[in-house]
């Protein structure tokens, strides 16, 4: 039996903890906040369970992970058909995109210009330096400029030509116009639009993992931010929330920039300088409570235009068949921002007015508005800026040289991955130690290289 300390109780940390526990190890999880789950948690507002934004479990989840989740949740894991919309050219188009719907709703010039882009593609010398370059090369100038460029600026806070091309390779799944056509054909069938979602909200997944881990003898300390990790040849000493613990291994899902601050011996100044150079985009989540049973029939509205503050609007009630109140609904508006900017510092009431103003601009129905609740997330979207890519690579390289301390997960790898990706990271890390005393670093390195191929699914 090996003693393992896991930092963070998001999906990556919890899956690593549960799997390592099942393999016979003594695992303790340290969570800084009062509750588990991270951004994959759910919580209650006025009797309704809501998530930290719009989330869903994709059918592309690897079979071994999907089987695990199905075992944990049973019939509470529901198969649902997506019913979203995206705003393009001041018109609503089905999302995922469907061929007939696009033809019917998008202007003729969009189809013509996109077709010309495809014809010109073989004669254009490609560049993949920036996000704008990468998307233009793959999908053409029209799709890049009308959709991806403004959406990128809205999410990451800087123009698409100042973002590294790696951001597009991580975030944009379509590789060519042909790939879009294939996706259109697939999404035109119900099976191509399905997703999985728990009856009691997205957070039911991490809750089930945590409960099983505890039932198996694992320990989770909440309200326990790790303030120091002291490494030695044979063990590590973890200080967290007034608790001191010795562990043979520390697996950290904390932001890699934070890990550089709390680990001892301290890294070189060059590593600390690199960590300080990287920026992460925050988000304000606005939950508007409405005195009506349903706002629209759609689960999510995607809003790439810079004319609105909201990047995505979701209605949690429409994601599931659950025990939700009949006489009310809640909208969740996702507003990307920088920590400390005007949006971040706004009151709940002011945020609510921003959202209501955006709804009016979009021509959405008038809402029977009651009140607004907010959640402020300081670290959501890692920003792959051209000018700091060397620093990012330096920090990631340092993170793979820490011996008994292993960073992983979205924050540990500075990536924007989906739930099934982060669950896979936790599972693979636990499998790399198996029933032995030491992590097989060769096996783990292979997994890390595989993680670099992950592409976010919307």
Which role fits each region the language model picked out?
Residues 91, 107, 116-228, 232, ...:
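Active-site/ligand-binding neighborhood in enzyme catalytic cores
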Residues 2-29:
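N-terminal Rossmann-like FAD-binding beta1-loop-alpha1 element of flavoenzymes
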Residues 12, 35, 257:
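Conserved Rossmann-like nucleotide-cofactor binding loop
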Residues 23, 225-349, 353-363, 367, ...:
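Mid-domain catalytic core of redox enzymes
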Residues 21-44:
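Glycine-rich FAD pyrophosphate-binding loop
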Residues 386-458:
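C-terminal lid/capping helical subdomain adjacent to the catalytic/cofactor pocket in oxidative enzymes
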Residues 8, 79-81, 222-224, 230, ...:
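Short loop/edge segments at beta-strand edges and connector loops
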Residues 46-123:
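Dinucleotide-binding Rossmann-like beta1-alpha1 core, especially the glycine-rich loop
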